[in-house]
A protein has these predicted regions:
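Low-complexity, PEST-like segments
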Residues: 1-122, 139
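C-terminal engagement modules used by replication, chromatin/transcription, nuclear envelope/ESCRT
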Residues: 143-158
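Short alpha-helical "recognition helix" segments of helix-turn-helix
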Residues: 50, 124-133
């Protein structure tokens, strides 16, 4: 896949994630407002609640998932063999964003369970990405706010 196609697919996956986030966010915000919360306070609470308690699909590229999962599984095997390995994932140049790293570790853990049951890595990744739900939204509250109100891209949650 060339770079342009990759960027387009990434944008589409982000849009799907954002759509899923916004649907859950608006339902949560309505519930908080019905309870008489101040709009500003309800917005912050709805963002934090949706991020922590939403169970979205994994909106990631299959090729990228394959590379990241194989990378993590190989580093796990090296650690188990006692061979020299890097101290942590960041040392090898893996995802530096904490939330993104947590997402990849979660996907890898699910793939690992399926491969132990006899599925190939490719089929396990396909199954996880198509049928499993994430434990949370792997975005920060600040990023979530930019999805809710695009005009607030320069403002953080207050």
């Amino acid at each position: 896949m060339n770079d342009m196609q990759s960027q387009i697919e990434h944008r589409e996956l982000c849009q799907r994630r954002d759509k899923e986030f916004l649907a859950l966010y608006h339902a949560t915000l309505d519930a908080f407002l019905e309870r008489g919360m101040d709009h500003r306070q309800a917005r912050r609470a709805a963002v934090e609640f949706t991020i922590a308690n939403g169970h979205p699909h994994y909106h990631v590229n299959h090729e990228r998932a394959y590379r990241c999962v194989c990378h993590l599984l190989n580093s796990e095997q090296k650690r188990g063999n006692g061979s020299r390995t890097y101290r942590n994932i960041e040392d090898k140049g893996f995802a530096k964003n904490r939330l993104r790293r947590l997402m990849w570790l979660e996907i890898t853990q699910r793939v690992g369970v399926l491969t132990k049951r006899g599925l190939s890595i490719e089929k396990a990744i396909d199954h996880v990405l198509e049928h499993c739900r994430a434990s949370r939204f792997f975005i920060s509250p600040t990023t979530a706010l930019t999805k809710i109100c695009p005009a607030s891209r320069t403002r953080a949650l207050r």
